[in-house]
């Protein structure tokens, strides 16, 4: 049994070796095929490049050849034209010529004379143009002098800087309102109207009267509650009587004072009115 196992193992190892050898051979073949394919591709690419280069060269050669042929034909045609005698050639083979109509030479001469005359006239024109320009200049000078005279005749309007600045007048009016003498200042702005002169005088007198009015000394102060005593009925009665007597006297004095002033104000108003 041992011998059989050893024999089987040897046979299996031999088979493995054979398989390995076959695989190595296949790999070598594959490598060779790949190299062959790569070489074929490189050869094809080189062929394509060569063909393209040859095609370009052929195209350039054809262009050069065509140019040479065209130049050669042109040169031959020019030589033929130079060598061809005009008298010996028949009318059919003569080259085409553009004939001018009859009488064209006369028209050209007339046109040349007309151009010469026009050139001479144009040479004489500058003097006339200078005279016209001088007339225009003189007319422009006349217009400018007339415009300047009209401007000088018109009265000049006062500039904005000549107008009076009312800053001082505003300050004076403010101070007059603070003091109460609104219409008493001599530096008033403008002359008042005749209709409002008396009214202004009356209003100013009233304002001065209200400001300068002093409390009358005849009035006795009102009794305080602390001055009165409970039960002092006679003292209260005397105080009431005194107050009732003093009030009508003060009112009468006020009426007389205001009446006199109003009368004087009215007289002033009538005197000032025209």
Swiss-Prot record:
Residues 12-21, 28-95, 226-245, 260-274 have a biased composition (Basic and acidic residues). GO terms for biological process: actin filament bundle assembly; angiogenesis; muscle contraction; negative regulation of actin filament binding. Transmembrane segments: none annotated. Residues 182-194 have a biased composition (Polar residues). One of its GO terms (molecular function) is actin filament binding. Signal peptide: none annotated. GO terms for cellular component: actin filament; myofibril; stress fiber. It comes from the Eukaryota. It is found in: Cytoplasm, Cytoskeleton; Cytoplasm, Myofibril; Cytoplasm, Cytoskeleton, Stress fiber. InterPro entries: Caldesmon, Caldesmon_LSP. Pfam families: Caldesmon. Residues 1-102, 179-274 are annotated as: Disordered. Keywords: Actin-binding, Calmodulin-binding, Cytoplasm, Cytoskeleton, Muscle protein. Control of actomyosin interactions in smooth muscle and nonmuscle cells (could act as a bridge between myosin and actin filaments). Inhibits the actin-activated ATPase of myosin this inhibition is attenuated by calcium-calmodulin and is potentiated by tropomyosin. Interacts with actin, myosin, 2 molecules of tropomyosin and with calmodulin. PANTHER family: CALDESMON. This is Caldesmon, smooth muscle. It comes from Meleagris gallopavo (Wild turkey). The gene is CALD1.
């Amino acid at each position: 049994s041992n011998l059989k196992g050893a024999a089987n193992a040897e046979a299996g190892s031999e088979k493995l070796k054979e398989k390995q050898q076959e695989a190595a051979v296949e790999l070598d073949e594959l490598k060779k095929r790949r190299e062959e394919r790569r070489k074929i591709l490189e050869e094809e690419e080189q062929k394509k490049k060569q063909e393209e280069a040859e095609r370009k060269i052929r195209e350039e050669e054809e262009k050069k050849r065509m140019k040479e042929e065209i130049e050669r034909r042109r040169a031959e045609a020019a030589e033929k034209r130079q060598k061809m005698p005009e008298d010996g050639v028949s009318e059919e083979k003569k080259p085409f010529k553009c004939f001018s109509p009859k009488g064209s030479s006369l028209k050209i001469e007339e046109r040349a004379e007309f151009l010469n005359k026009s050139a001479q006239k144009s040479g004489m024109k500058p003097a006339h143009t200078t005279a016209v320009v001088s007339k225009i200049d003189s007319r422009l000078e006349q217009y400018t002098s007339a415009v300047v005279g009209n401007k000088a005749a018109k009265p000049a309007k006062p500039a904005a800087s000549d107008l009076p600045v009312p800053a001082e007048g505003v300050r004076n009016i403010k101070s007059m309102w603070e003091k109460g003498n609104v219409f008493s200042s001599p530096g008033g702005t403008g002359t008042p109207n005749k209709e409002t002169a008396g009214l202004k005088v009356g209003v100013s007198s009233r304002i001065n009267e209200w400001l300068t009015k002093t409390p009358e000394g005849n009035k006795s102060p009102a009794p305080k509650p602390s001055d009165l005593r409970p039960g002092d009925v006679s003292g209260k009665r005397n105080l009431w009587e005194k107050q009732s007597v003093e009030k009508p006297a003060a009112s009468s004095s006020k009426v007389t004072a205001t009446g006199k002033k109003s009368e004087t104000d009215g007289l002033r108003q009538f005197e000032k009115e025209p």
